[in-house]
Design a protein with these regions (language model features):
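A generic alpha-to-beta junction signature in SAM-dependent methyltransferases
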Residues: 39, 83, 131-132
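Local beta-strand N-terminus motif with an aromatic residue
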Residues: 42, 100-101
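Class I SAM-dependent methyltransferase SAM/SAH-binding core
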Residues: 46-96
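A short SAM/SAH-binding and catalytic strip from SAM-dependent methyltransferases
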Residues: 102-120
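A short glycine-rich, Lys/Arg-flanked "PGG" loop and its adjoining helix->strand segment in the class I
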Residues: 118-135
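SAM-dependent methyltransferase
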Residues: 138-207
Length: 245
């Protein structure tokens, strides 16, 4: 059964909320430590696209403002209607573009969702323009990946009350465009395929990201060499990039 990314996340959340929230909080803590987060310095965050981090970032602070903007209206409606995401204000693209946020989060290699070099560059510029303090993104080191790692991520197993869920991420690379690939994530449980998520993506290299950010006039840009981030359903590490405006 082909599904959206948010369906796979929500299915896991509903099966074992306590474990899910623990996993998400661990990822949130890594992001906070990497950017030297201090709640007194930041008052709002905008998350690009649906992401499990919606359940966690600074949720314990009533004064902190949480926003999300999605290119996919299905994602936006899902967040708006979710009973446990009422603290998130979902904005339209026009609404998000009219204001500034202290933090903009583009996680899970978000910019690889854009299929051309120009569309990636444009989206990075747009994300940068929405923040007045920091843009945080995560990125895989596609340049130095081993051949086998370019094809498949190590399987991820998450145990829940309903059984062991195995997540397997496979990539098929375009034969004419070496940076383009189709990514398929399979969710398996109890001998059955619970769901399949398919997305077409494009690699984004460190040097590309750094150049695009510096061309925008960023005063500070760094990629963490000590703290690493992992997608909720993957054991494959992503680097955390922090751009201070």
């Amino acid at each position: 059964m082909t599904m959206y990314w948010y369906n796979a996340v929500d299915n896991l959340y509903k099966q074992d909320k306590q474990k899910f929230l623990k996993l998400v909080e661990l990822k949130a803590q890594i992001i906070k430590e990497t950017m030297a987060f201090n709640i007194d310095d930041y008052g709002s965050t905008l998350i690009l696209g649906f992401n499990p981090m919606l359940w966690s970032i600074c949720k314990e602070d009533d004064k902190f403002e949480y926003y999300a903007v999605c290119t996919d209206e299905h994602e936006a409606d899902f967040i708006r209607n979710h009973e446990d995401l009422k603290h998130i204000k979902v904005l339209t693209d026009a609404e998000a573009s009219e204001r500034k946020f202290d933090i903009v989060l583009a996680l899970d290699s978000y910019f690889t969702r854009f299929g051309t070099e120009q569309s990636q560059k444009d989206m990075i510029a747009k994300a940068h323009s929405m923040t007045n303090k920091a843009l945080i993104t995560t990125i895989k080191d596609f340049k130095n990946m081993k051949s086998v790692d370019r094809l498949i991520d190590p399987p991820m197993v998450i145990n829940s009350d309903s059984g062991s869920h195995v997540f397997l991420c496979h990539r098929e690379w375009d034969k004419t465009d070496k940076q383009k690939f189709k990514e398929t994530m399979y969710q398996l449980c109890c001998g059955e395929t619970q769901g399949v998520v398919i997305e077409t993506k494009r690699t984004l290299y460190f040097k590309q990201l750094a150049k695009y950010i510096h061309d925008l006039g960023c005063k500070e840009f760094r990629i963490s060499q000590t703290q690493f981030y992992k997608n909720l359903f993957s054991r494959s590490y992503e680097y955390i990039a922090v751009a201070k405006v």
